[in-house]
């Protein structure tokens, strides 16, 4: 941020704060939206938004307040992935295998969180600081391709009720 966007002090932390606050605000609405359109579509939408916003952010040569809009969208997009990923994993397995599949999910998720700073750090040091956003876009493309191949684990929409059943109340 200091080199590419000429930001001084702790101003670059504001970008992460905007993402985080947007994600926190988004968690419950995303859960509601995902129940209507499905987890897979919500995740794919999140990946598309992430990739698009990373691509746009990579174009800027200096920080501009409009970037906060993109960072807010990134927070929303990240939340749409996070809210739906583990439930999809759990939905794909039997009750006896929940622990095993949760272990797989966290092993790969945490491995990515360990490996990407090493890979991106190598690019930042040996190529350019401007590689961070293209690197992110590339992995969004890979995530989209991978997620588009998932066939199970989506939420099952509630069956439409007959007009009479809409007046029924639970005991």
Label each residue range with its predicted role.
Residues 49-62:
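C-terminal ends and interior cores of transmembrane alpha-helices
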Residues 135-169:
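Multi-pass alpha-helical transporter architecture, strongest
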Residues 80-94:
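Intracellular juxtamembrane helix-capping segments at the cytosolic ends
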